[in-house]
Design a protein with these regions (language model features):
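Hydrophobic/aromatic beta-strand patches that form the interior of the parallel beta-sheet core
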Residues: 29, 49, 72, 101-103, ...
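Donor nucleotide-activated moiety binding/catalytic core segment of transferases
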Residues: 55, 199-202, 218-266, 270-271, ...
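Active-site and donor-binding regions of nucleotide-sugar-utilizing enzymes
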Residues: 1-143, 155-158, 162-163, 265
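Catalytic binding pocket for nucleotide-activated donors in carbohydrate/polymer assembly enzymes
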Residues: 231-236, 263-311
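Soluble or luminal CAZymes and related metallo-dependent hydrolases
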Residues: 13, 105, 193-203, 296, ...
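Conserved catalytic-core segment of nucleotide-activated headgroup transferases in glycan assembly
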Residues: 137-232
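Active-site regions of enzymes building and remodeling cell-envelope glycoconjugates
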Residues: 27, 45-48, 69-70, 234-242, ...
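Short acidic active-site motifs
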Residues: 35-39, 245-249, 303
Length: 311
């Protein structure tokens, strides 16, 4: 059984993984995360690959072990920003002892787990991310855009901490973050920076839409964001707010991507799309160095508009 977290983000890659495993004569089940408590015990698989290992799902993992399943983690989040804090809390809580193996996005994460003494070296494997494996294999295929919008500039937002779709409030998000190893004081500092950046992102979009009136802008909220946060942008004739569809189909069909520390910039790089980031909204508390290196960093809206005019 492979647990699927967010279908818009994860289903393509995990389906590819399931296909590869099935070709090796394995029977594979893709199980929605919120149905795993019922479906996994009913299937009683030999192996369960869960999407993360944190306090909220430890009871599930323990039950799978009791029923005789091997349990591994293929973390769909890849890496948290405060990796030192995350692994310290995760390891000190003892929950890593409940699994048989861990599949990481890269060697940094693998080495951190091993160096913390959380799991032995022969139980941790740097496998990469199925989402990017899918892109690597299929990036040359034409993607079908179900909304039939052509020649658009894609703006991907990345502010679920401020604007959660599945939590009742920011306080609940902070509580959830604390449970998975994020320090509360750092979260509160980050929220201040995220709030400023999110409102700046909306202002930026308005300015670009008014400056480049002949361009179509598609604002695609993060899968874990509430899209109503951006409803004021829908008043602009050349701006569309669309959460449906996968990031792959939107990125593959766009003429350029605008983002702020969003991992879809990695996907855009596979498709060799122009990638722009509003440097004036970024801060050290938000910055992801690897993603920054993929992007053209603009110092203001006017500079970004000049770059976009060339596309």
């Amino acid at each position: 059984c492979i647990i699927v977290d967010n279908p818009l983000r994860d289903l393509n890659g995990l389906t590819k993984l399931a296909s590869v495993l099935a070709q090796e004569s394995n029977q594979v089940f893709l199980v929605p995360m919120y149905f795993q408590g019922h479906d996994v015990p009913s299937i009683a698989p030999d192996i369960v690959i869960t999407n993360f290992l944190r306090p909220p799902n430890v009871d599930h993992v323990k039950k799978y072990r009791i029923q005789g399943s091997l349990v591994g983690v293929l973390d769909t989040e890849g890496i948290c920003k405060d990796i030192e804090s995350y692994w310290h809390v995760t390891n000190s809580s003892g929950i890593l002892s409940t699994i048989d193996f861990y599949l990481t996005w890269g060697l940094i994460q693998k080495n951190k787990i091993v160096n913390e003494g959380a799991l032995s070296k022969n139980r941790v494997f740097a496998t990469g991310c199925p989402r990017y494996d899918f892109l690597f294999l299929f990036r040359k295929r034409a993607q079908t855009n179900s909304n039939k919008i052509d020649n658009y500039i894609l703006i991907n937002t990345n502010f679920p901490l401020l604007n959660p779709a599945y939590s009742k409030s920011m306080d609940e998000e902070i509580k959830n973050g604390r449970q998975v190893g994020y320090r509360e004081d750092l979260q509160k500092i980050q929220i201040m920076h995220v709030e400023k950046a999110a409102h700046g992102f909306i202002k930026m979009t308005k300015q670009l839409a008014r400056t480049l009136k002949n361009e179509t802008f598609v604002v695609r909220p993060h899968p874990f964001e509430d899209e109503t946060f951006y409803s004021e942008l829908s008043k602009l004739k050349n701006v569309k707010i669309i959460k449906s569809g996968t990031s792959i189909e939107w990125v593959s069909s766009c003429k350029a991507l605008i983002h702020l520390n969003c991992s879809t910039s990695v996907e855009a790089s596979f498709y060799k799309k122009p990638i722009y980031s509003p440097g004036w909204l970024d801060t050290s508390e938000l910055r992801e160095a690897a993603l920054k290196n993929l992007s053209t960093i603009c110092e203001n809206v006017d500079e970004m508009a000049l770059w976009l005019k060339q596309q």
